[in-house]
Design a protein with these regions (language model features):
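Extracellular beta-rich repeat passengers
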Residues: 2-153
Length: 153
């Protein structure tokens, strides 16, 4: 999953099975860092993600489940992350400002085989408790409610 340029929609019952050729489950940008309104953004991305599961390849692979950068904000509810070196990697000053303003949060999450739950590379001062609550309460996507008849390749 990849968002940018002020995306503010909702994602529900998201199931991501990580593959060898990918290094992240989600990469969320507030604006496109190559083009766009990045010199003085008017809008930041601020999606709401509910019932999310990301299965990685194991914490020894040094991959990130979720990277938030370039000023994105995001609200996560009911998350299950498994098999990553980093659960959340937050980058860039504007992303940190979103955390300090209460515009980025994670509620009800379970971390399995995650080495570091939150990495703060924003320059802003905050800790895990300022972003994440309800550790151990996340069950993730309701996979069984929609997977009947689907096949995996």
């Amino acid at each position: 999953v990849d968002w940018t340029e002020g995306y503010t929609g909702s994602l529900t019952n998201v199931y991501i099975e990580h593959r060898q050729s990918h290094d992240k489950g989600i990469e969320g940008d507030g604006f496109n860092t190559d083009i766009g309104n990045n010199s003085d953004p008017v809008f930041w991305s601020a999606p709401t993600i509910t019932n999310l599961t990301i299965n990685g390849l194991g914490s020894s692979n040094q991959n990130e489940a979720i990277r938030l950068r370039a000023g994105t904000r995001a609200t996560f509810n009911n998350v299950l992350l498994e098999g990553f070196a980093e659960g959340f990697d937050l980058d860039d000053t504007e992303t940190g400002i979103g955390v300090l303003n209460g515009e980025t949060s994670v509620t009800d999450i379970t971390f399995n085989d995650i080495t570091l739950t939150l990495k703060n590379d924003t320059g802003a001062t905050f800790n895990e408790a300022d972003v994440i609550s309800g550790i151990g309460n996340g069950t993730g996507a309701d996979y069984n409610s929609w997977n009947s008849g689907w096949t995996r390749n």
